[in-house]
Amino acid sequence: MKDHTESFKKKSLLSRLKMPIAELEDYYRRKRHFDRNKEIRHIALRRAYSKLFIPLLSMDRALHKKKYRIIGDRRIQTKNPKIYACTHVGSTDISVVYEALKDHCYWFWGDIGEYYRKIDGLLVFLNGAVLIDTRDKQDRRNARNTAVKVLQKGGNLLIFPEGAWNITESTPVMHLYTGAVEMAIESGADLIPVGIELYGNTFYINIGRNISSRNMQPDSKQKYTEKLRGAMAALK
């Protein structure tokens, strides 16, 4: 990996179009580090855009003959920002659960290679996304800090804290990283567990009750991460 602290020079669109994907990923990884102190802007505009984006997701789902059913929704109305912590069953669950939630969220998105030079990437960018190269420690730190700033500005976050697809039947929820709880503590966000199952072409989505971060302490992040994991497992 290149040193993120080296000087960064923005490149023209034409130059970026000519870059190989690996080089383009490195360019944007360094750009995210360069921009790490920038203010989060245009959340209201992105929220308005999501009213158009979600119907597009519905159309795409219908074209691929996918369905979803909400089998429970125990969300409590709140003025606090929200972190939707979802179980992860495959590559398309993020778009389906976002459609089902009907609540504007920034996507905490780790599929960097799929983001560039595709219309999907542009649409997600307009909606709002926190990109992360999970292989890179500095980029993980930058993504976490950016997500906290989004939440502090009143935005919501959609995240898969398992960090990988869970296709095992014996483990309802895999090990969770503590990042979701850490971000909730720093921003005052509510954690909302979401269980997702896929049978055939139908997603079954169960939305749990808010978990307040008000009384959480940083030194108890592992305890509350286990509480979140238990809540997610109970929804499957």
What are the language-model segments listed below?
Residues I70, L123-V124, L191, I207:
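Structural signal for hydrophobic
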